[in-house]
From Swiss-Prot:
GO terms for biological process: methylation; translational termination. This is Release factor glutamine methyltransferase. Its EC number is 2.1.1.297. The lineage of its organism: Bacteria, Pseudomonadati, Aquificota, Aquificia, Aquificales. Belongs to the protein N5-glutamine methyltransferase family. PrmC subfamily. It comes from Aquifex aeolicus (strain VF5).
Amino acid sequence: MRKVFKLNKVKVKELLKKVESEYRRDAEIILSYLLKVSPSQIPLMYAREIPEEIVKRFFKQMKERKKGIPTAYVIGEWECMGRVFKVKKGVLVPRPETEILIERTLELIPQDREMVGFELGSGTGCISINLLIERPKLVMYATDVNPDAVELTKENAKLHKVDDRLFVFLGNAFEPVKGMKFDFIVSNPPYIPENFWEILPEEVKKEGYTSLIGGKKGWEFYELIAEEGTKHLKENGFIALEIGHDQGKVVKELLEKKCFKVNIFKDYAGFDRVVIAQRWS
């Protein structure tokens, strides 16, 4: 009589034990993606048996991760404000610090007021889209020089059902919205000095030079926003910016020279991270 050998199923805990400790967090995120659950649920599922096909996909994606590909690019998505956004190589991956920018911006947008905002450098679209979801009367315009970022923003807008209130254009900074005025301008522009490029980790470089490098000094985009912002803001409008941890003073001075009242907010590590600049009434 012919014997039939049954494949032994592997449990979540056993699978994670096969991963080196330095990749444990990445493994949990990848596995949660494959199982369609939140990473926080993984410890509660240690006894769950995993289908063979998912085990194969898990090891394939872990192999990519160990080659230095960021986890976000391996799974093709990342969370921001508890919402999932599609991501791709060459487009900035959403970070926790950007959630501070979103939260501070929301504080200045009343729930019941019709407003029009502009985002310089949309990336995945996570800033504009989160603002639109939280403020149903808001309309956003956004630009990016990266065609992949523009398409990704449009895709994410459709995913989150706000594409009817988000207008995205391919182009440099304010050029696609020349002559328009907005209630506010929001941006997480590239702010790393160009001489830092060579010392950045290789996996960070995969997010793209134009996504990360802000020019020779690193704050060139803030100079541009300070200069052009006055032309594109309505009366009593405001500017909300994410900044590098050591750029608070210089960005504050740039905006104060243009008659803005400036407040700086810190990130979770205690570093300067968000600037809110409001026009004097």
